[in-house]
């Protein structure tokens, strides 16, 4: 399945066969790719594999002047290693709900990159997975057939479900969030890791998405987006879980929902690219704030119970190297059988005003630790 397109892997090298795989691949048998209790037996010698890849095409409906870096999903038979099904995003432009202003902005894009394999990255799909068994299909809604695919577009701000048989988009949120049921979601900007929470996990059947913020969407030109590209902008991230039938938000982690009365500056969550969200068996959500290399576990009530910041830099020799993390998953200890299970030590975070850095000799200054802080005495704790 790597014989998909001829190209150069690196400048100066000869032409070779490339799959041009990017962002995601999923083996059928686990719809989300992360741990689900009693649902983790994968036969990698049989079944099928979804691969998300790039493919350069010309499509005059999108842009008459330059080629596209299109997104293509191909399904591979693992036994024969043959491609048995293909879906190209550009073939379905008429099913995506773009208005005339958006289509005009795409037509006006003219910055043809000069690099090998370059072009107009008009859709920028970053995930694909099977829906898997779910209550909506069991209730008679064929849009949610377990073999159907769910995906999203960073550039267009679209979430979509694709019928595996016909290839048509049978369910969609976006690209506009100002009318109808889509309005309940608020604007989804530059999304990543859109997937249906799998059967056996809290929230099963709902859709979970890392709504990055930053900029995305096509529309009329403005001072902020003079070419009509990246017209929707927001400088914070949301993680949202919603009912795909009603599009009612069930749970949202964002500055507007998760701030506590004593948090003067509010929560800090912003990654304008990459990132993900995983529903854990205990009902918590593991969030990868990828641009900052930060992974956190958040409870349903928005408490931070675990945090990790990656110390590893991408290309540490380059100026401005960053500790990016594309996507992190929590897995059980026995998924790494060569390691013994370590002791788990609970941590009491305590109150911030009790945190004191000791001096070089180990002593701690007395700032009234253990007594009611001055601001609480003066305000009555309000």
Predicted regions and their residues:
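Histidine-/acidic-rich catalytic cores in large beta-rich domains
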Residues: 1-382
């Amino acid at each position: 399945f790597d014989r998909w397109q001829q190209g150069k892997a690196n400048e100066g090298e000869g032409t070779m066969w490339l799959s041009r795989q990017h962002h995601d691949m999923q083996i059928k048998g686990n719809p989300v790719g992360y741990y689900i209790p009693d649902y983790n037996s994968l036969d990698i010698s049989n079944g099928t594999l979804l691969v998300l890849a790039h493919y350069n095409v010309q499509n005059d409906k999108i842009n008459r002047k330059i080629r596209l870096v299109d997104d293509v999903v191909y399904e591979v038979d693992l036994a024969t290693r043959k491609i048995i099904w293909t879906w190209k995003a550009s073939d379905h432009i008429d099913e995506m709900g773009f208005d005339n202003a958006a289509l005009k902005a795409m037509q006006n894009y003219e910055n043809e990159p000069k690099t090998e394999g370059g072009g107009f990255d008009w859709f920028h799909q970053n995930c694909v997975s099977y829906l898997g068994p779910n209550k909506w299909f069991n209730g008679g809604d064929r849009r949610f057939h377990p073999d159907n695919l769910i995906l999203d577009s960073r550039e267009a701000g679209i979430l979509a479900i694709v019928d595996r048989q016909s290839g048509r988009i049978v369910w969609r949120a976006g690209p506009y969030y100002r009318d109808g049921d889509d309005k309940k979601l608020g604007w989804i900007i530059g999304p990543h890791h859109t997937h249906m929470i799998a059967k056996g996990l809290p929230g099963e059947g709902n859709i979970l998405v890392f709504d990055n913020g930053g900029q995305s969407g096509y529309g009329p030109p403005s001072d902020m987006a003079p070419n009509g590209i990246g017209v929707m902008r927001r400088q914070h991230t949301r993680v949202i879980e919603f009912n795909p039938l009603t599009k009612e938000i069930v749970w949202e982690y964002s500055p507007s929902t998760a701030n506590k009365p004593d948090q003067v500056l509010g929560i800090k969550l912003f990654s304008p690219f990459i990132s993900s969200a995983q529903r854990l068996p205990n009902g918590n959500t593991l969030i990868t704030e990828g641009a900052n290399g930060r992974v956190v576990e958040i409870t349903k009530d928005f408490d931070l119970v675990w945090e990790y910041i990656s110390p590893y830099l991408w290309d540490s020799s380059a100026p401005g190297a960053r500790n990016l993390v594309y996507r992190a998953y929590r897995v059980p200890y026995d998924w790494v059988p060569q390691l013994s299970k370590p002791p788990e030590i609970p941590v009491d975070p305590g109150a911030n005003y009790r945190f004191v850095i000791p001096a070089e000799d180990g002593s701690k200054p007395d700032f009234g630790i253990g007594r009611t802080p001055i601001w609480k005495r003066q305000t009555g704790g309000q």
